[in-house]
Amino acid sequence: MQALLKAQINKTDRNDARGMAQMMRVGLYRPVHVKTQRSQKLRMLLTHRKLLQSKAIAIDNDLRGTLRNFGFKVGTVGAARFEARITELIENIPDLAVLVEPLLVVRRVLREQLGILHHRLLAIVRNDDVCRRLMTVPGVGPVVALTYRATVDVPARFRKSKAVGAVFGLTCSKYQSGEIDWSGRISRCGDEMMRACSMKQLRACCGRRNGAGSKPGRCRSPGAAG
């Protein structure tokens, strides 16, 4: 679109409107699905939850890194005992505690609000028949199910089930010219959040044992014996 408009000698609003109308007439652009209000609200819940989660993890990593400079190693602790472990390390160093305490307060608030959003997410999934059905698939949890529900939005807009993979950006790119014909990696043109959830679900399926002789981290064919 921009290349066509720049090709015009005279740049005016009338010429721009005429150029855009001509491009629409050619038929190179496809209509875009506008998500429903419910889908947009679900996406907002998922993005806000992810934002709080990433900020809380960033604070944890920052505290681990800065305390390591002073010779303190936090070690392997869960989210519930993280603050107690930090307080234990700096309780006898007042000048260091003054610098660390603000981050602990912010982390505490982030974790509290993250829990509220997560419980809200679980309540929505619990009352949604489609999400409960999706969770019967191995590796699919509440977050993946709700992300899929919000991304697909209106299933009737897909003529075939194979088209869903293209919307997620999980189909292979194609390059063909003369005798050259090869398929590249996935296009990654679709929804980034859904694609990330799909990869997590795939790793969860590959990481579990599927009967005798199966090793963790190796995917088995659905029709394989055993």
Predicted regions and their residues:
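A detector of single, family-specific signature residues
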Residues: 1-226
